């Protein structure tokens, strides 16, 4: 394989090094596409909802060092004026000339969420889908909101989905919706489910709820695979049902990579101990994991490396309409790549063909 500039320019067994070219011999190792986290609130002490643009640029290097070369900056439910400022800060980070993971857009998780499944979102700022407010936020972001999370049972939700389907990705999220309502949302244009099994009704054989959409080939589903949010046996069951449409996500907060302590998420206090992050009342509050670690978990749960790796790079790229840029190793794509051992030990990360400093 040859990299020219920041893209893969040639592939083939017949290639040989030209004079002056640097050569990387990866004998005995695997070369993987860089991983893509479509749902992450932050890590390394900074949060996409709270931190200034400079801090957001800083943590992109932290993502890259753990194998995440692409991400969607994921927001929380905040006060309206603060939400506008939040979008502007993320826009600033996207426009900065920094090193590290690429921000491909914003995953707007809130405020259009159900109060009965609010999780760690502040109920004081939840609201019904509002096209005018959304347009304001999208303008503040520079048009960079790529994924919008919402509860399809809220007044105006179906109209919102029909209005923005095709322009934005719409995800069913934080909802008590039954299967029939979820199916209507997909018919209207939603094609994504936020952290499957979490912040939704549990699966029942007569009332499958949103979980029942997992084998609908129209729908991409996020899955937090830290071993805490979803039991390993359920991860195996879900991969057996529809591995080609699953996206491993971290749903990480600023505490990821930082250790035990008390942190803030969307203005709420989060307590971290070991691998568990929770509000004071015990409600799970995001994770302290990363997609590379979770991909390793999935393999240890008994899923084939091929399916686990695809769920960390190719599937999310397809889900976000970015498969012509990232998610695979083929001619013309960005040279965002990981060098790993066969037992998934991360040895080197490349972004745009340039080695990331460890």
Predicted regions and their residues:
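Alpha-helical scaffold segments that flank or form the walls of functional sites
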Residues: 30, 38, 48-102, 125-140, ...
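His/Asp/Glu-enriched, well-ordered alpha-helical/loop segment
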Residues: 212-221, 239-250, 255-340
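Histidine-rich, glycine-flanked metal-binding segment
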Residues: 1-32
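Divalent metal-dependent hydrolysis catalytic cores, especially in the metallo-beta-lactamase
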Residues: 41, 57-86, 101-114, 141-153, ...
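Active-site core of metal-dependent hydrolases
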Residues: 138-258
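Active-site gating loops and adjacent loop-to-helix segments of metal-dependent hydrolytic enzymes
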Residues: 62-72, 114-142, 184-196, 207-220, ...
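Conserved, mostly hydrophobic/aromatic
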Residues: 28, 39, 63, 108, ...
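Active-site loop-to-helix "anion-binding N-cap" substructures in soluble metabolic enzymes
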Residues: 35, 42-51, 72-82, 199-215
């Amino acid at each position: 394989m040859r990299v020219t500039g920041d893209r893969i320019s040639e592939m083939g067994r017949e290639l040989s090094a030209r004079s002056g070219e640097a050569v990387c011999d990866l004998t005995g190792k695997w070369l993987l596409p860089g991983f893509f986290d479509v749902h992450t609130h932050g890590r390394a002490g900074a949060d996409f909802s709270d931190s200034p643009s400079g801090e957001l640029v800083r943590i992109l290097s932290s993502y890259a060092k753990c194998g995440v070369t692409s991400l969607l900056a994921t927001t929380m439910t905040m006060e309206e004026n603060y939400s506008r400022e939040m979008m502007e800060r993320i826009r600033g980070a996207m426009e900065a000339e920094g090193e590290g993971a690429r921000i491909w857009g914003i995953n707007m998780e809130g405020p259009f969420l159900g109060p009965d499944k609010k999780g760690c979102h502040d109920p004081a700022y939840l609201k019904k889908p509002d096209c005018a407010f959304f347009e304001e936020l999208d303008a503040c972001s520079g048009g960079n909101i790529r994924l919008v999370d919402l509860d399809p049972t809220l007044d105006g939700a179906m109209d919102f989905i029909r209005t923005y389907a095709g322009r934005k990705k719409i995800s069913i999220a934080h909802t008590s919706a039954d299967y029939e309502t979820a199916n209507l949302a997909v018919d209207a244009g939603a094609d994504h489910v936020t952290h499957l099994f979490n912040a939704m009704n549990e699966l029942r054989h007569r009332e499958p709820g949103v979980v029942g959409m997992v084998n609908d080939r129209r729908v991409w589903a996020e899955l937090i695979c830290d071993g805490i949010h979803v039991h390993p046996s359920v991860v195996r069951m879900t991969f057996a049902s529809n591995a080609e449409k699953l996206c491993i996500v971290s749903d990480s907060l600023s505490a990821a990579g930082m250790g035990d302590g008390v942190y803030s998420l969307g203005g709420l206090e989060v307590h971290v101990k070991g691998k568990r992050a929770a509000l004071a009342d015990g409600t799970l509050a995001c994770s302290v994991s990363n997609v590379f670690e979770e991909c390793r978990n999935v393999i240890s749960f008994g899923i084939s490396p091929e399916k686990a790796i695809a769920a960390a790079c190719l599937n999310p790229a397809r889900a976000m309409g970015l498969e012509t840029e990232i998610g695979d190793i083929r001619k013309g794509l960005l040279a965002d790549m990981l060098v790993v051992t066969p037992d998934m030990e991360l040895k080197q990360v490349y972004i745009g063909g340039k080695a990331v400093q460890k």
